[in-house]
Amino acid sequence: MKILNSLEGYIDTYNPWKNTYALFRSLLGFSTLLVLLFNSTDILFSYSANNVTCENVYIPTAFCFAKEYSINFEIIRYLMIFILTLVVIGWRPRFTGLFHWYICYSIQTSALTIDGGEQIATVLSFLILPVTLLDSRRNHWNIKKNNNESFTKKTVLFYIMTIIKIQVFIIYLNAALERLKNKEWAEGTAIYYFFSDPVFGLPEYQLNLMNPLLESNFIVVITWLVTIFELFLAASIISNIRIKRIALVLGILFHIGIIFSIGIVSFGLIMISALIIYLHPVQQNITMNWCSPLFKYIYVKGKRNFKRIGGESVKFLTKLFHS
């Protein structure tokens, strides 16, 4: 009974209208916007736009309708770019939320996608849809200090946000466990093959620089660290706020590293947005203090080690010159 009363009290003050939710939506929309800005429909449908069909889908995509009514795919792309720009700047979430999901769904279902990011974007934009429909603000960047919605709406908002967190938890847990079933990941050689892959691998100049490391025994350690780190991110769902913040910073750095190494920018941004809504408190605004626990830990540890090393050095020099 006490737990139920505590939960009821928490929900009664629940207020997700902070910049955490706004940054999540904007990054998620921006990732898809980049795909459409830098890839024409000739690339997105390089397998042949004539093969786009609505026969095997429950909900026809925008490109299915375009083909049916002989509308140029580029017109659809430009329209999507316009709508996603509205999503990124935060205009009228109640109106743009549904279009955001439908754009992600259309790209995932009809276009040529290869890295899995669009599928995650489709799922997340669908799960956040009820929240956007309940968001009556003109812009999702307009922060509300208090949430004056009814208790029923607050309850829906709370459970939807919880479901999204569980979904991100499943993504990381599944990624780690599925790797353990794979022979190359279990043996610790998967990173070598992945970085050498002609599609997802490193650019040639980076590969030449990394080859000594990739061909060494240390690659086994690196490969296993990736799996362990993803298990750590999954386990962070039940950790305290300090661990969550450390996991968030490390997770963002991890995906930034992937972006700069193998160039899957949209996927990286999607996962960073997922980490933000997963690990940062939804009811708190993101400030520069959110990463302070990690940097404070590094600073304190570094300072202690510096003092210890410095002290040992002084003792050594004293013995050397004054003994």
Swiss-Prot record:
TM helices/strands, residue ranges: 27-49, 70-92, 112-134, 155-177, 219-241, 248-270
Gene behind this protein: sdpB
Protein's name according to its UniProt entry: Sporulation-delaying protein SdpB
Compartmental location: Cell membrane
A GO-annotated cellular component: plasma membrane
InterPro entries the record matches: HTTM-like (IPR011020), HTTM_dom (IPR053934), Sporulation_SdpB (IPR023894), Sporulation_signal_mat (IPR052964)
Keywords: Antibiotic biosynthesis, Bacteriocin biosynthesis, Cell membrane, Membrane, Transmembrane, Transmembrane helix
Function as written in the Swiss-Prot or TrEMBL entry: Required for the maturation of SdpC to SDP. Not required for SdpC signal peptide cleavage, secretion from the cell or disulfide bond formation.
One BP term from GO: bacteriocin biosynthetic process
NCBIfam families: export_SdpB
Induction field: By Spo0A during nutrient starvation. Repressed by AbrB during regular growth when nutrients are plentiful, in association with the transcriptional repressor Abh.
Gene ablation phenotype (knockout): When the sdpA-sdpB-sdpC operon is deleted, increased rate of spore formation; a double operon deletion (sdpA-sdpC plus skfA-skfH) makes spores even faster. A single deletion mutant does not have SDP activity (active peptide of sdpC).
Bilayer topology term: Multi-pass membrane protein
